Amino acid sequence: LQSVLKIINDNITNKDLTPRYIADRLAISPRSLYRKMEEIGEDSPTDLIKECRLHIAKDLLLTTKKTIDEIVFDSGFSNKVTFFKVFREKYELRMKHLEEVRQ
């Protein structure tokens, strides 16, 4: 798991960061990656990538004055629509409310 997290953290802004990308770096098949993560009781690689990106975005939102566009890019999301959707699903908070709190 540590090697998976290192690959994710080292490549978080890489739009090509996918389970296949991680598996290639570990010299295993994507199926083997999913299986190994399941065996240790972890989320899927896709969910782990999303969680890491959300954690970074939340930290940037709370600790910086960066714009939403900058935060979307810096946390590795491909676009604002995707970011807003997964952020709302995870934190049950709309961006409008968060922007009000940040001011």
What are these regions (language model features)?
Residues 85-103:
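…primarily DNA-binding HTH/wHTH and HhH modules…
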Residues 5-17, 37-41, 58-67, 87, ...:
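Basic, amphipathic alpha-helical hairpins
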Residues 33-34, 82-83, 87:
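Short hydrophobic/aromatic patch on the recognition helix
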Residues 25, 29-30, 78-79:
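Short coil turns linking two alpha-helices in DNA-binding domains
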Residues 21, 25, 74-75:
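Residues within the alpha-helical elements of helix-turn-helix
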Residues 20, 31, 67-70, 81:
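Residues within helix-turn-helix
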Residues 39-78, 100-103:
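Terminal helix-turn-helix DNA-binding modules in bacterial transcription factors
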